[in-house]
């Protein structure tokens, strides 16, 4: 039986239990989305404490909240998308092989869109967190840095899922974009690390 898909009303402990359950979905994509949302939340907190140090802090709060609102629903969307992959994989063997392969390929392609959206939003979180680490209240530099590193983890995890889902679609532009996002976020977090060295 599939786990419930209303993650927004679960406690952290319940969400962890849902992930740990012996079900195929939710899994890595949902965790990546929640990780990105947590990074956005931490970024919003650091921005709220940075209003005296950075005139753009109120805008950063709004941007971080918007990113969190984008990322949280992607946790549920990813679980649903992967359930559709599982349905395609469970098609009866009597179904024409070409039809079955096409259904699986289409489901995997659609399933790649969600982690791609998670990666895109999480790069934005990392960018904002990096700005806060540099310009915001330095008493919260560590929090802003943690937000950037969590966002990097969300990007890398999501990009990996894009590559897995599109493994049979050589030349798909989403593969290159996923790799590009990983490189972008690595540069961002490298700057955050070097700023405190």
Positions of PLM-derived features:
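Amphipathic alpha-helical interface segments
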Residues: 78, 82-158, 165
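Inter-helical turn/loop segments and adjacent helix faces that build the functional surface
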Residues: 52-55, 132-140, 164-176
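Amphipathic alpha-helix face/heptad-repeat signature
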Residues: 31-38, 60, 67-74, 111-121, ...
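C-terminal auxiliary extensions adjacent to catalytic cores
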Residues: 158-169, 174-197
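Conserved phosphate/anionic-ligand binding catalytic regions in large, soluble enzymes, centered on
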Residues: 21-44, 139-157
């Amino acid at each position: 039986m599939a786990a419930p898909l209303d993650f927004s009303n679960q406690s952290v402990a319940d969400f962890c239990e849902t992930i740990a359950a012996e079900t195929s979905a939710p899994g890595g994509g949902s965790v990546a989305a929640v990780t990105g949302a947590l990074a956005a939340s931490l970024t919003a907190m650091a921005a709220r404490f940075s209003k005296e140090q950075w005139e753009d802090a109120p805008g950063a709060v709004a941007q971080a909240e918007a990113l969190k609102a984008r990322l949280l629903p992607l946790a549920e969307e990813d679980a649903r998308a992967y359930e559709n992959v599982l349905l395609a994989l469970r098609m009866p063997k009597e179904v024409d092989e070409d039809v079955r392969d096409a259904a699986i390929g289409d489901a995997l392609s659609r399933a790649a869109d969600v982690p791609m959206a998670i990666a895109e939003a999480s790069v934005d979180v990392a960018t904002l967190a990096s700005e806060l680490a540099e310009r915001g209240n330095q008493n919260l530099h560590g929090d802003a840095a943690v937000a950037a590193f969590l966002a990097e983890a969300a990007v890398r995890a999501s990009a990996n899922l894009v590559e897995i889902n599109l493994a049979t679609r050589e030349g798909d532009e989403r593969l290159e974009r996923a790799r590009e996002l990983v490189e972008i976020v690595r540069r961002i977090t490298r700057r955050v690390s070097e700023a405190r060295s």
